[in-house]
Amino acid sequence: MLPIAILGGTFDPVHNGHLRVAWEAAEALDAQVRLMPAHVPPHKPAPLASAAQRVDMLERSLAGQSRLVVDTRELRREGASYTVDTLRGLRAEFGEAQPLILLVGADAFGSLPTWREWRQLFRLAHIVMLTRPGRTEPWSGELVGEAVPRRARSPRELQDTPAGKVLSIPVTPLDISASQVRALLATGREPRWLVPEPLLADPAILAPYRQQR
């Protein structure tokens, strides 16, 4: 069964680093990847762009292909965006047999014990770490105890079961950040080659970041 993977974030704005990671994960896992903009991230400042503006940027960026899609369920939920609630919603919608995958960076994986109901994440989905060459993150003892016995040897194992496996896949380390893009726009510069080309087609699309000046 084709897995459904989720990649969360504020996407404020979406940039080429987000899209490259999502595409590489889709190909490596033979999965549909859903990019999920967060409503109110628990550990980050509120986004500069509105929810509607961030969705519009994502939809423009993903036009013309079907492997990466936008999922707005977190924006429709009031309050903070907690991953465990999102996974419960996906599980209820797609059923117990559907393979679900949570995509996280290696740094985020290392911090899982600080997440709400973090042990439940392994019961609701597989967790795939997106790793970059030369970077390692320490794991706490409780995370080692939860994750190591769940390690998968190949993406195929994630297709054969609905949840509970841990896998690492390497991704291209594009050195791009949303804060970098926002800083360029705030000083009147263009983030060409850093953001998807459709975002540069109309000055109004990136206006929320230019208006910081």
Residue map of PLM features:
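Nucleotidyltransferase catalytic core that binds NTPs
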Residues: 1-213
